[in-house]
């Protein structure tokens, strides 16, 4: 009988588990497993800004139990692959309100002995519009990191820099990190990484701010 040869994926996984396991620092577990064959064509023909709102259907129709089931499925998948720490954004906005984050905390309690879970609020509706700001403020007290998407407020109101101020103020006042989506459109006109660096210094948040995506650098 021929000796079994492990796949490269299995080899890498097993070696990393020996050294303490993976860290998944960026996920959207509340929306995991929601893609369908019918949606693929729609998403394929939509730009990123449109996708920010296309997910409203899932958010609007998902109950706490629905979110909880997706969190549990995501967490168990991470554990099965040797992930020992899992950071995920969680939608908290006027569409889904606090249903997703309530489910997230419920799941964290169940798996607290199996994996480290950290949450950041996802602000697809921005932080400038009053109702969006209300849910941002509520969500900021329910997460481990302040998440942000300044370009949403730049597109809608021309207030991307003001949105950064709100994000950094929220993080600083709570003594937690800030995790910001910037420069996602691969355009030389985008300067969000530089702007976020300037705002980080202005707010005295050096070493406590993460910029993610950054493909326009």
Predicted regions and their residues:
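Alpha-helical hydrophobic/aromatic positions enriched in membrane-embedded helices and signal peptides
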Residues: 16-20, 74, 173-175
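Histidine/acidic residue-rich metal-binding segments in metalloenzymes
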Residues: 6, 99-111, 129-217
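Generic hydrophobic alpha-helical membrane-span motif
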Residues: 32, 88, 187-189
């Amino acid at each position: 009988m021929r000796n079994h040869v492990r796949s490269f994926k299995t080899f890498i996984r097993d070696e990393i588990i020996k050294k303490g396991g993976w860290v998944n620092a960026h996920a959207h577990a509340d929306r995991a497993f929601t893609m369908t064959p019918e949606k693929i064509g729609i998403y394929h023909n939509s730009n990123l800004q449109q996708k920010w709102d296309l997910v409203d259907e899932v958010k609007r129709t998902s109950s706490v139990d629905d979110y909880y089931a997706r969190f549990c499925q995501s967490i168990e998948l991470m554990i099965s692959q040797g992930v020992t720490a899992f950071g995920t954004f969680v939608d908290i906005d006027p569409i889904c309100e606090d249903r997703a984050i309530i489910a997230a905390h419920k799941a964290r309690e169940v798996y607290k002995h199996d994996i480290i879970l950290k949450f950041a609020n996802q602000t697809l509706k921005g932080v400038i519009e009053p109702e969006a700001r209300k849910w941002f403020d509520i969500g900021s007290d329910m997460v481990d990191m302040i998440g942000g998407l300044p370009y949403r407020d730049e597109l809608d109101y021309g207030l991307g820099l003001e949105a950064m101020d709100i994000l950094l103020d929220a993080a600083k006042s709570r003594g937690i990190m800030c995790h910001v989506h910037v420069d996602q459109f691969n355009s030389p006109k985008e300067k969000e990484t530089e702007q976020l660096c300037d705002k980080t210094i202005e707010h005295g948040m050096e070493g406590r701010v993460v910029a993610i995506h950054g493909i326009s650098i």
